[in-house]
């Protein structure tokens, strides 16, 4: 079996976790108490969904997941929510005081008190797996727990499970709106610390998702539940090939192989289509060509940046539902003839396709329409460097005045860590720039670094 363990860290991670597991349960017909009427085999069968759920002798399906937060309120909602019987109480881990939006508290002071307990619980889950494939880690960049504790946990996971893949789903701070003033600090510190421990990181920015909810779903004031359900659909599309049998299945490690040309350049851009409300879907049936085209519209991306300014290095199209390879090939051929989509000259073919016959499921009473087919595109493009540049600029503005730095130093960090992290990200921006150059331009100067 190729099991995956999901780790949800901090408020953002836990709330996205709720949305994801709610959706997985609906997709597999698992009830909130963990029973699955359609599953006739008792105990751990060899069904595809066993990658994400373990089965008890009593026929209960338990998610292979851990929820961690340094303060209890958010996880308490899981403990009392609809799906409270789904999880083993030991899978929900909380501390007493939160990280107060402070990376240093999440990584050093408060985080280190709880990290051994968390690793212990993860070890228990890992021991139930016959062939653990890797970890999916959900967190935000901006919060103290999401940034600090995640980076601590990733370092420890690398020690304990060296070669296992670690994929991140990270909530990147939105360009305009912000939930904390110190987001740029936390983001840059966590990116620097986890850069060498993460194999692939899918970034999602709240503002981009707000805009999609407003524009495509006509939700005037999107709530976090609206956002998370949309993120849940995306995560579900990415993991569908692990949980269902399909025509072209894609493995966790396969994502990395096809999307990550150099170890540091592992931040694919995620685009999902169609995001459409029930009223609209009633009147239009979207063809494979239409949803494929929609993926190349910057408006449907999960991070605000413009791929038309960058170059694509690799592209992975994950279709689900009523899709046949013939239509996909035609749609991709059309895309390739359009000159707006530029690939780097050292990666000529760049499209990987996965097809899964399980149509997208939607949460009843949710905002998304039930559609026959959907596609999730993961693309590694140099345009995502815009997102880093934006963040680095905000960091510089604050750091030039050493604003808020004393909160971090007071928790045992050194100022040197800030400049070290900032230099690392400057190098990352440079890496992206070099990758986007034509092979003729920079004659092998970058070659020594890798």
UniProtKB/Swiss-Prot annotation:
Undergoes a tyrosination/detyrosination cycle, the cyclic removal and re-addition of a C-terminal tyrosine residue by the enzymes tubulin tyrosine carboxypeptidase (TTCP) and tubulin tyrosine ligase (TTL), respectively. Dimer of alpha and beta chains. A typical microtubule is a hollow water-filled tube with an outer diameter of 25 nm and an inner diameter of 15 nM. Alpha-beta heterodimers associate head-to-tail to form protofilaments running lengthwise along the microtubule wall with the beta-tubulin subunit facing the microtubule plus end conferring a structural polarity. Microtubules usually have 13 protofilaments but different protofilament numbers can be found in some organisms and specialized cells. Interacts with Ote. The record marks 450 as: Involved in polymerization. GTP binds at residues 11, 71, 140, 144-145, 179, 206, 228. Disruption phenotype: RNAi-mediated knockdown eliminates microtubules in fat body cells, resulting in defective nuclear positioning. The active site is at residue 254. Disulfide bonds: none annotated. Keywords: Acetylation, Cytoplasm, Cytoskeleton, GTP-binding, Hydrolase, Magnesium, Metal-binding, Microtubule, Nucleotide-binding. This is Tubulin alpha-1 chain. Mg(2+) binds at residue 71. The keyword rRNA-binding does not apply. InterPro entries: Alpha_tubulin, Tub_FtsZ_C, Tubulin, Tubulin/FtsZ-like_C, Tubulin/FtsZ_2-layer-sand-dom, Tubulin/FtsZ_GTPase_sf, Tubulin_C, Tubulin_CS. GO terms for molecular function: GTP binding; hydrolase activity; metal ion binding; structural constituent of cytoskeleton. It catalyses: GTP + H2O = GDP + phosphate + H(+). Transmembrane segments: none annotated. CDD domains: alpha_tubulin (cd02186). GO terms for biological process: lysosome localization; microtubule cytoskeleton organization; mitotic cell cycle.
């Amino acid at each position: 079996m190729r099991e995956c363990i999901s780790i949800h860290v901090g408020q953002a991670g836990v709330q996205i976790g709720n949305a994801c597991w709610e959706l997985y349960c609906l997709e597999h017909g698992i009830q909130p108490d963990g029973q699955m009427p359609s599953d006739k085999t008792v105990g751990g069968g060899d069904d595809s969904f066993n990658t994400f759920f373990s089965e008890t002798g009593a026929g209960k399906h338990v998610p292979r997941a851990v929820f961690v937060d340094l303060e209890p309120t958010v996880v308490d909602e899981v403990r009392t929510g609809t799906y409270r019987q789904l999880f083993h109480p030991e899978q929900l881990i909380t501390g007493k005081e939160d990280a107060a939006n402070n990376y240093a508290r999440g990584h050093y002071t408060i985080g280190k008190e709880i990290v051994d307990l968390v690793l212990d619980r993860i070890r228990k889950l890992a021991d139930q797996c016959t062939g653990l494939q890797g970890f999916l880690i959900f967190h935000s960049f901006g919060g103290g727990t999401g940034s600090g504790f995640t980076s601590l946990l990733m370092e420890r996971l690398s020690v304990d499970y060296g070669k296992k893949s670690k994929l991140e789903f990270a909530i990147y701070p939105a360009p305009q709106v912000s939930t904390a003033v110190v987001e740029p600090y936390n983001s840059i510190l966590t990116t620097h610390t986890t850069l060498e421990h993460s194999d692939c990181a899918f970034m999602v920015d709240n503002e981009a998702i707000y805009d999609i909810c407003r524009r495509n779903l006509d939700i005037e004031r999107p709530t976090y539940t609206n956002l998370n359900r949309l993120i849940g659909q995306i995560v579900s599309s990415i993991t569908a090939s692990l949980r269902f049998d399909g025509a072209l299945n894609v493995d966790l490690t396969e994502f990395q192989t096809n999307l990550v040309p150099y170890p540091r350049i592992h931040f694919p851009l995620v685009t999902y289509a169609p995001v459409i409300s029930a009223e609209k879907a009633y009147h239009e049936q979207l063809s494979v060509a239409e949803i494929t085209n929609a993926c190349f519209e910057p408006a449907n991306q999960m991070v605000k940046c413009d791929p038309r300014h960058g170059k694509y290095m690799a592209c992975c199209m994950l279709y689900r539902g009523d899709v046949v390879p013939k239509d996909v090939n035609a749609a991709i051929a059309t895309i390739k003839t359009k000159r707006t989509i530029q690939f780097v000259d050292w990666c000529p073919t760049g499209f990987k396709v996965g097809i899964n016959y399980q149509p997208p499921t939607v949460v009843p009473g949710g905002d998304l329409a039930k559609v026959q087919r959907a596609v999730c595109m993961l693309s590694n493009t140099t345009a995502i460097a815009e997102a880093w540049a934006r963040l680095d600029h905000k960091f510089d503005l604050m750091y030039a005045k050493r604003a808020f730095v004393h909160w971090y130093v007071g928790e045992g960090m050194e100022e040197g860590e800030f400049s070290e992290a900032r230099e690392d990200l400057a190098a990352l921006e440079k890496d992206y720039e070099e990758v986007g150059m034509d092979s003729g331009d920079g004659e092998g100067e970058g070659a020594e670094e890798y």
